[in-house]
């Protein structure tokens, strides 16, 4: 990646919003599309996090199906460097692990299908292999709860969804659990990791007090949201209707309260404050939620905490059927919608990830489709002032 395309568009048109209360500096808000020197690669951005050095951000993307690229940008979104991992490392899970300020990547071996844990070495612009787990096939998600580190996977031999807790140094597995799918879903997994059709919304989370782990994956002939005890034994489940419904994203609030997005066939539903029972056996369609007919249920939904004007909110980032983004802001305690903003107008974009910046703005990682068919990594920056106008 040798150059950056700066989209020659007025920001107010790109962001499709109103003016700010105060004049923002040029670096406070922007959109940048990162081009590739070869021009023929298709990129799928996966995750953005702060750099180890604190002077920018690390972006992990897939390209040409399941290959992996790491990119470093500075705080103003300027390209610094990129590194394409050797071809044996594939299928990066869609989030980075941050442990003691350092960034780690979980991925898969292209031939053996087993799991690697890699450390991103910013100084050398390279990666260091930390560990490999030959019995953990098809990794699908990784999560650091602050107390424990987990990897989710699909076992193609036993038709099970597995979850594995790692040691603090990431060198070994301390305990494992699994749930039985009772059917072969390998074709669905392969389509997921090679970006052939829509991605599957795997995730791992916990209740706010970490009494339970929440895992979204295949279970009992369906796509299900499974609650696990701390020893990774089964506690309860919200089953999907086969593979046509289930949870899309979740974010803990307190106790057993969550913000959730769920899908059912061709529709998305949001509930920013709902009580879930970790020991129930139920179906996801029983979770009360409001329909979002303008949104594309086949695209990623992200739910994270977002601080605006000193107050913490729940932010939902989703993709519309018309190839825009929708940023919806809800009160954390009551779940009231306090504002929303549509982003993007001139080029089709899809939500990938977002992260709040040190200056209380928001970096939004997206896939931008240039000239109708060229998939590129792009970054949209909303300033603190722009966020404040959303909740006015």
Locate each region found by the language model.
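Hydrophobic strand positions within the blades of repeat-based beta-sheet folds
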Residues: 48, 58-60, 70, 81, ...
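Bacterial Sec-dependent N-terminal signal peptides
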Residues: 1-46
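Aromatic (tryptophan-biased) beta-strands that constitute blades/sheets of beta-rich domains
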Residues: 25-44, 69, 78-85, 125-135, ...
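Beta-propeller blade signature
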Residues: 69-77, 115-125, 161-171, 223-231, ...
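Blade-level signature of beta-propeller repeat domains, shared across WD40, Kelch, NHL, RCC1
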Residues: 350-392
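Short glycine/acidic-enriched loop and turn motifs that connect beta-strands
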Residues: 63-67, 109-114, 155-160, 218-222, ...
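Beta-strand-rich domains and repeat architectures in extracellular enzymes and scaffolds
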Residues: 35-68
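Repeated scaffold domains used in trafficking and secretory/extracellular systems
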Residues: 42-50, 89-98, 134-147, 184-206, ...
């Amino acid at each position: 990646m040798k150059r950056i395309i700066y989209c020659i568009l007025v920001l107010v048109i790109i962001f499709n919003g109103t003016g700010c209360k105060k004049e923002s500096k040029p670096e406070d808000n922007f959109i940048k599309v990162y081009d590739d020197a070869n021009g023929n690669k298709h990129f799928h951005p996966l995750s953005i996090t702060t750099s180890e050095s604190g002077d920018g951000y690390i972006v992990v993307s897939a390209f040409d199906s399941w290959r992996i690229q790491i990119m470093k940008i500075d705080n103003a979104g300027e390209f610094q460097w990129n590194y394409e991992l050797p071809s044996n490392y594939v299928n990066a899970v869609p989030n980075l692990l941050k442990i003691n300020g350092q960034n780690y990547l979980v991925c898969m071996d292209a031939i053996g299908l087993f799991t690697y844990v890699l450390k991103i070495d910013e100084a050398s612009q390279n990666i260091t292999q930390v560990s490999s787990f030959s019995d953990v096939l098809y990794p699908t998600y990784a999560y650091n709860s602050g107390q424990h580190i987990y990897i989710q996977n699909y076992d193609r031999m036993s038709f099970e969804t597995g979850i594995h807790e790692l040691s603090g140094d990431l060198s070994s597995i301390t305990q494992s659990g699994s749930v039985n799918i009772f059917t072969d879903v390998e074709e669905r997994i392969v389509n997921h990791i090679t970006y052939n059709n829509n991605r599957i919304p795997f995730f791992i989370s916990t209740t706010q007090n970490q009494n339970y782990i929440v895992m979204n994956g295949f279970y009992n002939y369906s796509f299900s949201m499974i609650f696990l005890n701390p020893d990774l034994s089964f506690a309860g489940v919200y089953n999907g209707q086969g593979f046509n419904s289930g949870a899309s994203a979740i974010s803990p609030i307190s106790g057993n309260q969550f913000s959730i997005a769920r899908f059912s066939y061709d529709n998305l539903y949001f509930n920013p404050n709902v009580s879930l029972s970790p020991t129930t056996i139920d179906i996801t369609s029983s979770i009360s939620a409001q329909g979002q007919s303008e949104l594309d249920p086949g695209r990623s939904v992200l739910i994270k905490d977002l601080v605006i004007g000193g107050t913490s909110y729940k932010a939902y980032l989703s993709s519309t059927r018309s190839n825009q983004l929708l940023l919806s802001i809800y009160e954390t305690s009551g779940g009231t919608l306090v504002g929303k903003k549509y982003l993007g107008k001139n080029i089709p974009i899809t939500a990938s990830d977002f992260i709040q910046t040190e200056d209380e703005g928001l970096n939004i990682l997206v896939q931008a489709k240039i000239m109708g068919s060229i998939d590129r990594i792009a970054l949209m920056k909303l300033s603190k002032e722009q966020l404040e106008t959303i909740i006015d």
